[in-house]
Amino acid sequence: MADRLSLHSHLTNEGGPLAKSISGNDEQSPIEGRAASSRSAQTSATHKEARAPRSDDHAIVSTDRHVLANDRIKGLARRTFNKHVLSEIGGFSGLFALDAERFPDPVLVASTDGVGSKLELAIQLGLHSSIGSDLVNHCVNDVAVQGATPLFFLDYFAAGHIDPDIVQQVISGLVDACKANACALLGGETAETPWLYGNTDYELAGFLTGVVSRPRLITGEAIREGDCLLGLPSNGLHTTGYSLALKLLLNTAGYRPEQYVNELGDKVGAALMRPHRSYLSPIRKLIQAEVVTGFSHITGGGLTENLPRILPRGLAAHVDLSAWDPPPLFTHLKKLGSLDHDEMFRTFNMGIGLVAVVPADLVKKARLTLTRMNERSIVLGRVIRKATPRIVYS
């Protein structure tokens, strides 16, 4: 991605009016009243050492900040609890009771991820809550495409300097997304590691567990030649392609995040910071309608690398490029970087965030199911018999 010096040259008002001018909001969403869940009271070794009596004032301040951050987290996190959460805040681990009646013959489905280079931009703009939603939604989609229901989420937050206000904003985003996807924020870790991160830097990772009854597990093995590829739109880059996008927009073009660009139809920062969509609702509706043989969440690697992941041996995806027009963000990135087709479709989602594989005779029913929930769909192509390459564009 663009190096920090390049980003800093464009981002000079961290977290304040600049963030407001990019988002178009005069004030940030209130954190009071947001949902939450259980979080471990454990700290990294750094904080355990800081709790011992010392004359080092910095160590004492570090401990105070860490305690304040964790207190705020607890108030948020507890609100995502449901009847299946058995642990209270402060334990060594989170406890969750599986509903065996609802999920007979259960299979646990797990996913872990980060948000990549998008985090760098979020830090510089002070838009910390949206990055939490990005992370949860990404993980939710990864388990949902297997037919799983999200159960609980855990996060790992590490920073060079624990700022309770920033931690609260990040966790509030996690909590909002957990509530929206009906999963519990079961726990997490907050670590201060100044020898690894700069004073304003942090890293965020998440871990999500879901469950599905074995007979309802979706693996793609039921996909057959002639099945239709039904695409659901993304709302932007989601969480992939940011290294290249930041380089092209901020360095090559020299745009400022608060700058409105006609080719984008939006401010640069707003176009880049749109949250990663959760596709849980349309996935559930399609599963309930019994019209799908597989799903592909289009993340890093784009359509080119993600569609083949679900196809049985000997089958390939044929994608009709005339079926949809990629949103302006992607066409402008292509122009700025003089990028060829292959690089675009391997780097970006090109406006498609999820692909549902549907038998040809069920396409009408599938699209009607989506239309009824105001979800747009695009017939992208079909599954063909071909050993290699695993995806063909025409």
Describe the role of every protein-language-model region.
Residues 100-101, 114-116, 209-213, 235-237, ...:
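Short, glycine-/Ser/Thr-/acidic-enriched flexible segments
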Residues 75-235:
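Glycine-rich phosphate/pyrophosphate-binding loop regions near the starts of catalytic domains
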Residues 112, 203, 216-264, 268, ...:
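Short, acidic (Asp/Glu-rich) active-site segment that either coordinates a divalent metal cofactor
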Residues 2-39, 43-127, 175-184, 231, ...:
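Extreme N-terminal cap/leader segments of soluble proteins
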Residues 2-10, 19-23, 32, 39, ...:
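Glycine-/charge-enriched secondary-structure boundary and capping motifs
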